[in-house]
């Protein structure tokens, strides 16, 4: 790229895909300079070689965007993240349809709007604790599904328990040992496996809870949020993501 072209670039819109990154570059007046596609492993090197220092690099706040934003900021560029729903109005659906190239152009266009609200770039620590929360939520969903499966099997044998998972968890070992009920042998074995899985999920959730509680003790912002009436450790972590 000629040096004069490099100097003209004021902003680029970047669409991040799994294998290829699409770029749409404009000058200070918003005029298109070029559009191109790069392999992911070429992107940062290309930016350092072809973009002027401080150039705005706008991306949707999607999976992996915070990582790229941190990398770009460290290289001296102005990384901006935009919530996907704020980019949608700028997509030119009638001109070639929705694809990665038009998405990059839409992101570039959205970034220049004076009232645009940008997503704060998260630190690795923030993303780590949010990842922990996501894993815990996954365990929680798995546990709910496991409990429902156990209830479903028991119901087929005429065994019904109160809605409280604690009641079911306390009663299930005795139910499995009770030879007088109608449970078949294979059903008992299957439910024993499900019970062990349930307990394992409880242990994993408790581990996550300990990690979250430790984070709240160590993080002043989370500690302040947790002092608000009605906000516990997990909610205080969620508050900080915004």
Q: Which residue ranges define each predicted feature?
A:
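A detector of single, family-specific signature residues
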Residues: 1-242
């Amino acid at each position: 790229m000629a040096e004069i072209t490099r100097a003209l670039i004021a902003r680029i819109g970047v669409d991040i895909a799994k294998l290829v990154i699409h770029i749409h570059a404009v000058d200070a007046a918003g005029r298109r300079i070029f559009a191109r596609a790069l392999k992911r492993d070429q992107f940062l090197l290309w930016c350092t070689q072809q973009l002027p220092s401080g150039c705005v690099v706008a991306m949707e706040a999607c999976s992996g965007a915070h990582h790229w934003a941190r990398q770009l900021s460290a290289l001296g560029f102005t990384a901006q993240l935009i919530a996907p729903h704020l980019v949608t109005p700028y997509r030119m659906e009638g001109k070639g349809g929705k694809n990665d190239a038009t998405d990059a152009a839409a992101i570039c266009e959205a970034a220049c709007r004076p009232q645009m609200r940008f997503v704060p770039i998260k630190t690795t620590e923030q993303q780590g604790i949010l990842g922990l929360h996501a894993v815990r939520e996954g365990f929680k969903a798995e546990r709910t599904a496991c409990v429902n499966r156990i209830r479903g099997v028991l119901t087929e044998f005429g065994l019904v328990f109160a809605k409280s998972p604690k009641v079911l968890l306390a009663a299930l070992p005795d139910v499995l040992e009770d030879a007088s009920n109608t449970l078949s042998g294979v059903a008992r074995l299957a439910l024993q496996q499900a019970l062990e899985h349930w307990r394992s999920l409880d242990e994993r959730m408790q581990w996550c809870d300990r990690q979250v509680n430790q984070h709240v003790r160590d993080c002043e912002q989370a500690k302040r949020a947790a002092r608000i009436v009605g906000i516990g450790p997990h909610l205080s972590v969620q508050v900080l993501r915004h």
